[in-house]
Amino acid sequence: IKEYRTEEIVSYIKEHKEHSKIGILLSGDTGFYSGAKKLKERLTEVCSDQIKIYPGISSLSYLASKVGVSWEDAKILSLHGKDMNFVQTIHRHSKTFLLLGGKDTGRHFYETLLEYGLGDVQVHVGCQMSYEEEKILSGKLYEMKAEDFEGLCAVLVENPSYCKAAGMHLKDEEFLRGKVPMTKSEVRSVSIAELELTEDAIAYDIGAGTGSVSIEIARAGEQIRVYAIEKNPEGVKLIDQNRKKFRTD
């Protein structure tokens, strides 16, 4: 049968007990964002016999080999059906591999990187890989179009100018300030340390001013979600300018 839904596969197996050996073929690496994970969990519940898994080639290793780039030092993200931060990750790593997919994900990825001043990164895009319709493009992001990232595709980003700074603390003079009040450096450091943030934390900065606290929190973890709330129009503008300056999405 041609089927990808876990429950349908399990139902078929239950209904056909006459089969002593069953093979299930999935594309890609079974340990790399694969449907094999959920399927194995369900099969373990209904099958008493041993389950054997044989991995294929992941989209990451396939794309990397096609463009001649090693990937052992790449940061890996999946934006397929997920709303995740990725600008800061690309800003802080020499290589980032991303899986794109879903409505407008590719366009959002393309436009967001340009918005944050990352148009100079080298990008490799692979769509329909290993099929007859395979399309692989390489070049600077600013040379490409949003349409190049449409559909289910994999992207390998090389950023030779990535941020190598080990410390997360920012000095007051690094922020764009204007006449809007700003929480001073020492207070920011102590306050954020006391929060004991986790990597998946959600933070609300009410009365964010220039966004100094919001930005320092965002820099503390690439997937921390920060909501900066400010009613002063000048402050709102400064928050937007500072988040782009420090590439905290």
Report each predicted region and the residues it spans.
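Conserved SAM-binding loop of SAM-dependent methyltransferases across substrates and taxa
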Residues: T210-E222
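Gly/Ser/Thr-rich loops at beta-strand to alpha-helix junctions
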Residues: S27-S34, P55-S59, G101-T105, T210, ...
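Class I S-adenosyl-L-methionine
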Residues: I1-K52, Q223-V226, E230, Q241, ...
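Conserved class I S-adenosyl-L-methionine
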Residues: D200-G209
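Conserved alpha-helix/loop element of class I SAM-dependent methyltransferases that forms part
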Residues: K184-E199
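A contiguous loop/helix-start segment that scaffolds small-molecule binding in enzyme catalytic cores
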Residues: E3-E7, K21-I22, K95-V180
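Class I SAM-dependent methyltransferase SAM-binding "motif I" and its flanking Rossmann-like core
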Residues: G28-S94
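Short alpha-helix immediately C-terminal to the canonical SAM-binding loop
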Residues: V236-K237
